[in-house]
Amino acid sequence: MAETLTAQAAPVATAPAVTASEKFIFDTQGYLVLENFLKPDHIAKLLAATATTVARRREQTRTGAKQTGFTQVNGKDSTRIFYILDDDPLFLELLDWPAIMPYVHTLLSHMPHHCASDVIVAHASDFPKQVPGWHIDGHDDGFRNLGAPIPLLQLKIGYYLTDMTKPGASHLMVVPGSHKTKQSPGEPGPDGMLPGAVQVCAPAGSAILFHNALWHGIGPFHPGRSRTMLYYAYEHPWMIASQEHWGYTKDFYNSRLSPARQKFFHGFLFDPPQARWG
C-alpha cells in the first residue's frame, strides 16, 4: 500500500512571495502542497457552485443539449466536467486568483496561459473497482518525444474542496521525484502501487501544485468516502497544447474576460484577433 503524506505543507493566508524552500521542494519532489490555501467561506461558495454546475451539466448530458466542453457521468452520483471557466464566475475567478499567481509566475512563467480546467465529484459507491491509472500529463504521449527528463511545460493545480486528511478517499497519489527520472517506473505492484507512491492527504481548501512529468494517479476508495476537487493547469505562452482554448464561445472571450484575463489565452481567439505576444 502507498504510504500517506502529511508533511511538505506550507500554510498560506495572503499572497506572499514564493519561498526558497517551496521552490526547492517543488524542484526536487515535483509537487508542492499548500494547506488551507482557500478560506472556509470560499470553499463553501465553490462547493455550492459545483453542485449547481453538476446538476446542470448532468441534465445537459442526459438530454443531449449543447454544452461547453464535455461531461463524464459516472454512475448515480459521480461526475467529471471539463472546461468549467464559463460555468460559474467563481470558477473563472480562480484562473488568476491573486494568491496563486506568485506560484504560477515563479514556478512556470511570468506570462502563463490557461491550459485546462475541470471539476471532479466522486463517490466510492460509483467506483467499486477503481484502479490508480498511473500517468504523466501532456500531449504527444506526455511530451516524451522531448527526451528525459521531461521539462516543466505545464503546471497543474488541484484544489481539495472536501477534507482529505485521512487516506482512502480517492486521493491524488504521486511518486515524489519521478519527474526527474530517465526511466519508466515499470508496471505497478499487485496492489496497484508504484514504488514510493504516496497519497496526498490535506485539509479542504488545500492546493497541490505539480509538474507535468510527475507520475500520478488516484488512490484507494474506501466505502462511504467521497471527493470533490477542482483542477486548473497552466502552460507557457508559446505553446498551443490546449484544445480547451477552442472550447469556449466568442462571447466568452470578447465579453466575459477582463483585459488581464484575456492575456491567459492566445490573441487569435478574439474578434478581432489581438496582435500580441503572449
What are the residue ranges of the model-derived segments?
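Catalytic core of non-heme Fe(II) oxygenases with the double-stranded beta-helix
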Residues: P102-Y103, P128-C201, I240-G247
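Short Ser/Thr-interspersed hydrophobic loop/turn segments at strand-loop and sheet-helix junctions
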Residues: M164, H211-L214
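Non-heme Fe(II)/2-oxoglutarate
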Residues: A2-P11, G64-Q67, A207, L214-W215, ...
